[in-house]
Amino acid sequence: MTVKLDFEECLKDSPRFRASIELVEAEVSELETRLEKLLKLGTGLLESGRHYLAASRAFVVGICDLARLGPPEPMMAECLEKFTVSLNHKLDSHAELLDATQHTLQQQIQTLVKEGLRGFREARRDFWRGAESLEAALTHNAEVPRRRAQEAEEAGAALRTARAGYRGRALDYALQINVIEDKRKFDIMEFVLRLVEAQATHFQQGHEELSRLSQYRKELGAQLHQLVLNSAREKRDMEQRHVLLKQKELGGEEPEPSLREGPGGLVMEGHLFKRASNAFKTWSRRWFTIQSNQLVYQKKYKDPVTVVVDDLRLCTVKLCPDSERRFCFEVVSTSKSCLLQADSERLLQLWVSAVQSSIASAFSQARLDDSPRGPGQGSGHLAIGSAATLGSGGMARGREPGGVGHVVAQVQSVDGNAQCCDCREPAPEWASINLGVTLCIQCSGIHRSLGVHFSKVRSLTLDSWEPELVKLMCELGNVIINQIYEARVEAMAVKKPGPSCSRQEKEAWIHAKYVEKKFLTKLPEIRGRRGGRGRPRGQPPVPPKPSIRPRPGSLRSKPEPPSEDLGSLHPGALLFRASGHPPSLPTMADALAHGADVNWVNGGQDNATPLIQATAANSLLACEFLLQNGANVNQADSAGRGPLHHATILGHTGLACLFLKRGADLGARDSEGRDPLTIAMETANADIVTLLRLAKMREAEAAQGQAGDETYLDIFRDFSLMASDDPEKLSRRSHDLHTL
């Protein structure tokens, strides 16, 4: 043990000893101050550590709560469970570290302050008392006169006693100083050692805890990397869809209701206004859904659904042109009826078509469930003749020659129409009326999901078919359309799906064929095409269109302009040229497939449109084809004359009837201020005058809320049949009436 104070110097009580005493006392006083400060800091550290520990445990609980949010995700649940257990173990180790730190502070530092320094203070007090007593004895002994022997002897005895007491206390003080000096070194170093060992134990336990998760962390990192890549792809797709939807929204397009095929059949959902059945007849907006062969609605998601039609097979749907509100249709069941209102004409047609398709799907499913049937049970088609009829003025199936079977047989008799256009399943009973192809029920559902701007789906057995539409289907067909939309399939070595392929494969094929148009024959650059005749000088001839073998006597057998001349035309100009006399439906379909605007305006011919061009050619089928593909029945030329004006001027009664059925504006006036009725009266065309006056009467009755009678429908139906089946007779009739 190193001796800081020399005992010999202590006995001598030399100035060196006194100086050493003062120095040691100053050091011990500073030590006491610093130890007390360390204790205070340690107490603050422990308090902060416990706050940190409590906050950390609350933080871990918050992480655990994330696993209970939303639907269970196994990967996230496993990750959070493993990491929260590990974090809790680390926090337990941290609590042990705090306890060890507190114990070390109490055992080493606090003991040193309370016990070691207390003995030092007592020894110091005794030392200085002894020093004062010795000083007083020395002074008294020195002051005793020589003549006072007795007093001198007493003073000497007191001095000896004081010196002995001082020396004993001085030796005790010196010993206490030396002991406290050494104890200070040992206790402080032991305190630091224990503190570091507690820290080492804490971090060692944390390292071991995290090491157990090392492999899992690596695997999770790889999985997260893949998830990030997938998320980036999804984000890119969402951004692209966001841009498309934003452009669509800025373009003023209406949102379409959701239509898809679900496990319980066709599913369509969207908002409709519903008229209450109470005395006030109030209208309320509700969320309607067609699913599981039922029509239901609800106000809020958590509200129970209200069933409007329990079984779609026992109901019919019809338009309500006589209603005070626009865009109304009625669903009529055996026990009640429900008047509904869409937001626009297009949404109205979508909803009506969806209800009809759902009715068809319900009957098809019932027929599959009940098959095979006996000969006496019937086919099951005629039983639903009135259930799916659209009360819009079209021909009902019961009035068609031959009924349902006649339409199916007539359409399927066209070359290639006996099997589905997209998957080749035999006996298709659905059709896309704007494309002119037949489809199986599964492909028809996929076509319906594309939207009516790509494909308008109708049932061959369940929907009403106007005679001109049946004839249009027979003029086009699967072979012609596939020669257009599948022109490069063999060159691209693409495999066409078969009847046994999955829905996903068929859906991918149909999307690539009609939406992406991957298999079309590529046209020259737009820069190289023109709207006039011929082609630019120096440009090589365009390869001819796919060879199409038409039937003799049909529109497909009419001569077409040379392919070299057509190939140099803009798709819109090509559509315009093909719509003229003589019209060519295959070329028109080809132009539309290549992006032709169905309302393309020919500035060189008085801003005429393809529909006006087809009207001039008196082609009922070309006009029907253009209208089915979105042609505007009211778009006028530079003289302010629309298709109805031109049909009236030219005396084409069948076309006038067609345009009136498609909503042509009766009050539209040309640049000379004449409406179609004025023109018809000037040309003395009795048939067209009759049609126009009937249409005006129908409008007036609808404006007054009157239901009207069936005469209007019967007359229009007769003219439609005559225009489709015997157009020459209709032309002769118009000529005879004109000459009377």
Swiss-Prot record:
Pfam families: Ank_2, ArfGap, BAR_3, PH. Changing residue 280 to A: Reduced membrane binding and ability to induce liposome tubulation. Signal peptide: none annotated. PROSITE patterns: ANK_REP_REGION, ANK_REPEAT, ARFGAP, PH_DOMAIN. GO terms for molecular function: GTPase activator activity; zinc ion binding. Changing residue 29 to A: No effect on interaction with ITGB1. Residues 405-527 form the Arf-GAP domain. Highest level in lung and spleen. Low level in heart, kidney, liver and pancreas. Changing residue 280 to W: Preserves membrane binding and ability to tubulate liposomes. Its main location: membrane. GO terms for biological process: protein transport. One of its GO terms (cellular component) is membrane. The modification Phosphoserine is found at residue 554. Changing residue 568 to A: No effect on interaction with ITGB1. Residues 525-581 are annotated as: Disordered. Changing residue 389 to A: No effect on interaction with ITGB1. GAP activity stimulated by phosphatidylinositol 4,5-bisphosphate (PIP2) and phosphatidic acid. Residues 405-740 are annotated as: Required for interaction with GULP1. Cells overexpressing ACAP1 show an accumulation of ITGB1 in recycling endosomes and inhibition of stimulation-dependent cell migration. Cells with reduced levels of ACAP1 or AKT1 and AKT2 show inhibition of stimulation-dependent cell migration. Cells overexpressing ACAP1 and PIP5K1C show formation of tubular structures derived from endosomal membranes. This is Arf-GAP with coiled-coil, ANK repeat and PH domain-containing protein 1. It comes from Homo sapiens. The lineage of its organism: Eukaryota, Metazoa, Chordata, Craniata, Vertebrata. The gene is ACAP1.
